[in-house]
């Protein structure tokens, strides 16, 4: 087996993602409004373009919930879904799904690892009739189904799901270096299959992993990419999740999980966003300045991703009050360009040169404030300016001393009556 691939045959791997138990089927999901494209697609869930017509997908009969408001459908598809892959679309809280439907010609892949599915280079006899690809999704769930059509009345088409590829993680966020699972599974009649995981980013694409179930081998496996292969469960669903051991900024982008069967193939798409919060250091750590001299503050922001970061300076005069812009006490400031490290993260430095120190500047607090998309709130690192040769308590020191004195006074008053009470009682008895 190719290096870098671990096949984890975990029958329970899919249990956290599986659809409702077939013994107690849930009510059918609400009908889904769809855009029916006129052009014939290229197969596998790729739209073929052309004009769009309003259509409606119905699942398993009449649903209790009416469809979302919209134009009157010109075509209604009554879809039979034996594996329940479309059921999660109606589970509350329900987000109106997006849906695109286009006719297609069933076909297998042209990659070398998918050719053994059709050694005679001919489509199977079951590939006759009309075929469509339905791509339906919400922020929490995405499914692409290959539909085989049957007879129907005017304006109505009866279709059955022949293959469905789904994901419970259509959009993911991963920290640099932290393992991440890109969930994918498929439902289909028992047969040999070929799996392909492809990564696309900034116009470039690569096959991360390919797996052939007939040989249980991976003809293609990129280092760091692992296949979590689940066994077929009672609902006919097989998990084919991709695990990235140490994602880096270069792993950000679009991931395509494609499943090839003898009668055709389809795929689902996932988006991975990589992030890393910045580390912030401020120098010097101790800011002691002689009267009449200036100092320079440097704020170093490192190890962050993505690129955009904002660095600002703030000052609290005398260490009290609210933070304000230090423009009255800063002569000059500058910010370096971005520098990229070997792991793909970025760093940059901001500096501020202060005006010559005066007695009234003693105790000023300067802060470097960093804002970044990976931070829940801005990060602040501060330093206090101390004027050499200047003594005397600051407001914070006075407040602290007052609190200590208050506590000590209360403690003495609590202890003193206990010690003095016997003497007072003796005097009264005399």
UniProtKB/Swiss-Prot annotation:
Keywords associated with the record: Disulfide bond, Endoplasmic reticulum, Glycoprotein, Immunoglobulin domain, Membrane, Repeat, Signal, Transmembrane, Transmembrane helix
- For the keyword Metal-binding, the answer is no
Domain Ig-like C1-type, by residue range, is 139-273, 278-382
Chain ranges sitting on the Lumenal side read 16-399
Which subcellular locations apply to this protein?
Endoplasmic reticulum membrane
Q: Which InterPro entries match?
A: Ig-like_dom (IPR007110), Ig-like_dom_sf (IPR036179), Ig-like_fold (IPR013783), Ig/MHC_CS (IPR003006), Ig_C1-set (IPR003597), Ig_sub (IPR003599), Ig_V-set (IPR013106), Immune_Resp_Modulators (IPR050380)
- Name the CDD domains for this protein: IgC1_Tapasin_R
List the ranges whose topology is Cytoplasmic.
Answer: 418-430
Which region is the signal sequence?
1-15
Region of interest: Disordered: 61-128, 316-342
An example Gene Ontology biological process: peptide antigen assembly with MHC class I protein complex
Q: Which membrane topology describes this protein? A: Single-pass type I membrane protein
**SS bonds (residue pairs):** 34-99, 299-368
Q: Provide the GO MF annotations for this entry.
A: MHC class I protein complex binding; TAP complex binding
**Which residues are annotated as site, described as May be involved in interaction with TAP?**
413
Transmembrane region(s): 400-417
Write down the Gene3D superfamilies for this protein, in alphabetical order. Answer: Immunoglobulins
Q: Which GO terms describe its cellular component?
A: MHC class I peptide loading complex
Residues glycosylated per entry: 78
The UniProt subunit note reads as follows:
Interacts with TAP1 and is thus a subunit of the TAP complex. Interaction with TAP1 is TAP2 independent and is required for efficient peptide-TAP interaction. Obligatory mediator for the interaction between newly assembled MHC class I molecules, calreticulin, ERp57 and TAP. Up to 4 MHC class I/tapasin complexes bind to 1 TAP.
Q: What's this chain's function?
A: Involved in the association of MHC class I with transporter associated with antigen processing (TAP) and in the assembly of MHC class I with peptide (peptide loading).
- Fill in the domain comment: The N-terminus is required for efficient association with MHC class I molecule and for a stable interaction between MHC I and calreticulin. Binding to TAP is mediated by the C-terminal region.
What this protein is called in its record is Tapasin
Phylogenetic classification of the source organism:
Eukaryota, Metazoa, Chordata, Craniata, Vertebrata
